[in-house]
Amino acid sequence: MNQSLDRVGYTGNRMSQPLVGMDLTDLREALGSDQPGYRAKQIYEAIYRGQAANLVQISTLPAQLREDLAARHEVGLPEIAHLYQSTDGTRRYLLKLEDGRTVETVLMPDGERDTICISSQVGCPVDCKFCMTALMGLERSLTAGEIVGQVLLVARENQLRQDGGRLNIVMMGQGEPLLNLENVVKATRILLDPAGFGLSPRRVTVSTAGIIPKIAELGREPVRPKLAISLNASTEESRQELMPITRKYHLKDLLAACKAYPLRPWEKLTFEYVLLRGVNDTDADARRVVKLLSNLNAKVNLIALNPGPGIPYATPDPERVASFQNIVRRALPCFVRKPRGLDIYAACGQLKRNVT
């Protein structure tokens, strides 16, 4: 694969360039110097705050300007190739991108809260042995517009509003976000901009397998999402077996990077731990997790393995999960994530373009 495409995502040869993914600076350049500066802001707010699906819907613009823009640009949302609906209300979207590749996005309604799980890459290069996405390998990284477009499309399709504090975004779908950091940062700036999509930083989380240099880089961003770390083992040896990329990024160095990460007053680091029967789910593992995280402002999310074809591990019994949680939560906030969308392959670690 072309390395520049792998790094920054698809640019393509389309006749009309997408507006989704552009920030205010990009939009001003697209409009040209003959348009007043406030026109860019009108487009920006209409697309991200107003969720306009096409240029016709941006009624604040003069008709001639809309016509001129339409000759060169389109809003540029992905296309729904297929929608899978779970008995628990979860929806898995297979989205077709401009180059014909597909990526998956999941909506998880839960009473008064909705969560959209979005992807940062088509496939994933990290090769976690318990994750079905790893079986795809990496096809390419997504552009900022393709990342934001997932949110806009799912929000529009389900009449979700970004205000009111009920919508959460988690970048825990396909891909390793920190290996596409440039586009992830640009996308999250738009999602967190009050004039853009307008979410609070408390409502957006990016998950990483532990790409140490990029953790520090993300920490320097003035406006950034919350950070979650995929831990998944209590020893270096076990972690390297389950997550081969960690042979490059060692556990002690990861914990040091987490210690140095600048947390806001309200913030904790989240550590995610996928429990695999007989592999990393013992009481001794739980005690080692407590020791590893003892000097961090952290919480732990436990995920009992969501099974799938090609995954050589089993889900632990509920009693084993409860025992693990009870040990960890004596020292740290510890929660068990409820599986969502198991019947449509929409749960954590199951996103591999499966047809149900």
UniProtKB/Swiss-Prot annotation:
<feature type="binding site">
    <location>
        <position position="131"/>
    </location>
    <ligand>
        <name>[4Fe-4S] cluster</name>
    </ligand>
</feature>
<comment type="similarity">
    <text>Belongs to the radical SAM superfamily. RlmN family.</text>
</comment>
<keyword id="KW-0004">4Fe-4S</keyword>
<dbReference type="GO" id="GO:0070475">
    <property type="term" value="P:rRNA base methylation"/>
</dbReference>
<keyword id="KW-0819">tRNA processing</keyword>
<keyword id="KW-0411">Iron-sulfur</keyword>
<dbReference type="InterPro" id="IPR004383">
    <property type="entry name" value="rRNA_lsu_MTrfase_RlmN/Cfr"/>
</dbReference>
<keyword id="KW-1015">Disulfide bond</keyword>
<feature type="binding site">
    <location>
        <position position="306"/>
    </location>
    <ligand>
        <name>S-adenosyl-L-methionine</name>
    </ligand>
</feature>
<feature type="binding site">
    <location>
        <position position="207"/>
    </location>
    <ligand>
        <name>S-adenosyl-L-methionine</name>
    </ligand>
</feature>
<dbReference type="GO" id="GO:0070040">
    <property type="term" value="F:rRNA (adenine(2503)-C2-)-methyltransferase activity"/>
</dbReference>
<feature type="disulfide bond" description="(transient)">
    <location>
        <begin position="117"/>
        <end position="348"/>
    </location>
</feature>
<dbReference type="GO" id="GO:0051539">
    <property type="term" value="F:4 iron, 4 sulfur cluster binding"/>
</dbReference>
<keyword id="KW-0479">Metal-binding</keyword>
<feature type="binding site">
    <location>
        <position position="128"/>
    </location>
    <ligand>
        <name>[4Fe-4S] cluster</name>
    </ligand>
</feature>
<feature type="binding site">
    <location>
        <position position="124"/>
    </location>
    <ligand>
        <name>[4Fe-4S] cluster</name>
    </ligand>
</feature>
<keyword id="KW-0408">Iron</keyword>
<dbReference type="GO" id="GO:0046872">
    <property type="term" value="F:metal ion binding"/>
</dbReference>
<dbReference type="GO" id="GO:0005737">
    <property type="term" value="C:cytoplasm"/>
</dbReference>
<keyword id="KW-0963">Cytoplasm</keyword>
<keyword id="KW-0949">S-adenosyl-L-methionine</keyword>
<dbReference type="InterPro" id="IPR013785">
    <property type="entry name" value="Aldolase_TIM"/>
</dbReference>
<dbReference type="InterPro" id="IPR007197">
    <property type="entry name" value="rSAM"/>
</dbReference>
<dbReference type="GO" id="GO:0000049">
    <property type="term" value="F:tRNA binding"/>
</dbReference>
<dbReference type="GO" id="GO:0019843">
    <property type="term" value="F:rRNA binding"/>
</dbReference>
<feature type="domain" description="Radical SAM core">
    <location>
        <begin position="110"/>
        <end position="343"/>
    </location>
</feature>
<dbReference type="InterPro" id="IPR027492">
    <property type="entry name" value="RNA_MTrfase_RlmN"/>
</dbReference>
<protein>
    <recommendedName>
        <fullName>Probable dual-specificity RNA methyltransferase RlmN</fullName>
        <ecNumber>2.1.1.192</ecNumber>
    </recommendedName>
</protein>
<feature type="active site" description="Proton acceptor">
    <location>
        <position position="104"/>
    </location>
</feature>
<comment type="function">
    <text>Specifically methylates position 2 of adenine 2503 in 23S rRNA and position 2 of adenine 37 in tRNAs.</text>
</comment>
<dbReference type="GO" id="GO:0030488">
    <property type="term" value="P:tRNA methylation"/>
</dbReference>
<feature type="active site" description="S-methylcysteine intermediate">
    <location>
        <position position="348"/>
    </location>
</feature>
<dbReference type="InterPro" id="IPR040072">
    <property type="entry name" value="Methyltransferase_A"/>
</dbReference>
<dbReference type="GO" id="GO:0002935">
    <property type="term" value="F:tRNA (adenine(37)-C2)-methyltransferase activity"/>
</dbReference>
<feature type="binding site">
    <location>
        <begin position="175"/>
        <end position="176"/>
    </location>
    <ligand>
        <name>S-adenosyl-L-methionine</name>
    </ligand>
</feature>
<keyword id="KW-0489">Methyltransferase</keyword>
<dbReference type="Pfam" id="PF04055">
    <property type="entry name" value="Radical_SAM"/>
</dbReference>
<keyword id="KW-0808">Transferase</keyword>
<keyword id="KW-0698">rRNA processing</keyword>
<feature type="binding site">
    <location>
        <begin position="230"/>
        <end position="232"/>
    </location>
    <ligand>
        <name>S-adenosyl-L-methionine</name>
    </ligand>
</feature>
